[in-house]
Design a protein with these regions (language model features):
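Glycine-rich adenosine-cofactor-binding loop
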Residues: 3-23
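NAD(P)-binding Rossmann-fold cofactor-contacting core
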Residues: 27-49
Length: 225
């Protein structure tokens, strides 16, 4: 079987983890690599030609449409950019089926879990039985999504998060590193949970909650609007 030719969107920190996952998959059987990593696309002009874990930034994201034999995965998501993930995916201008799901070999995904297109699950993370993860989700290292929990499309889960059972995280939400989400809580669409939070009550759509226990932050304490 020929290797899958793949391009990562974005040259930031999350892309390092995704490239690491691709390289780790290739290292399982070096004589028959799973992926051919073509390079990286990024919209920051200063990044053109830069190497990211040895892989060149080839051009802007709009160039994806010119790479007709490649698959893609999005690596762009930070507190500054996470709400633009749907726009970034659209800007690539390629069919939905050309987005690759990337799972690090040291991640664990239950056979009964469902994981969508274009989603990345990085090293040490666990997706438990009957969990559902949507399209274009980024799950960073050592994060656990427990049974029957649902992660909406375009959401970002940072490193070291514990999502307990029956949690519902909405589309385009962002959960900061080291947080714990108690069973059955809901984090609404485009909401933010600050790093290190303990969420024991629902977080409404578009709101920012942080702390232990997590409480809503007034707008004067964040710059996300």
């Amino acid at each position: 079987m020929k290797p899958v030719r793949i391009v990562v969107l974005g040259a930031g920190g999350n892309s390092l983890g995704i490239l690491d996952a691709l390289m780790a998959a290739n290292a399982i059987e070096p004589a028959r690599p799973r992926y051919e990593i073509v390079g990286v696309l990024d919209d920051i002009p200063a990044n053109l030609g830069r190497l990211v874990l040895g892989h060149e930034v080839l051009g802007p994201i709009a160039d994806a449409a010119k790479l007709g034999d490649c698959r893609f995965v999005n690596g762009i998501s930070s507190l500054e950019s996470f709400r633009r993930i749907p726009e970034i995916v659209r800007r690539a201008g390629v069919a939905p089926e050309r987005f690759e799901t990337v799972v690090h070999p040291r991640a664990t995904v239950s056979a009964s879990a469902r994981v969508g297109r274009g989603t990345s699950i990085l090293a040490g993370s666990v997706i438990a039985p009957e969990a559902m993860v949507g399209d274009h989700v980024i799950i960073l290292q050592n994060t656990s999504v427990n049974h029957h929990s649902r992660i909406g499309d375009h959401a970002t889960l940072s490193a070291g998060i514990t999502v307990l059972g029956y949690v519902d995280i909405g589309a385009n939400a962002f959960v900061g590193g080291g947080s714990t989400l108690a069973p059955r809580v809901r984090v609404g669409d485009s909401a933010v949970v600050g790093a290190g939070s303990v969420v024991i009550r629902d977080v409404p759509a578009g709101r920012v909650h942080a702390g232990n226990p997590a409480r809503e932050l007034p707008r004067s304490q964040h710059a996300l609007d």
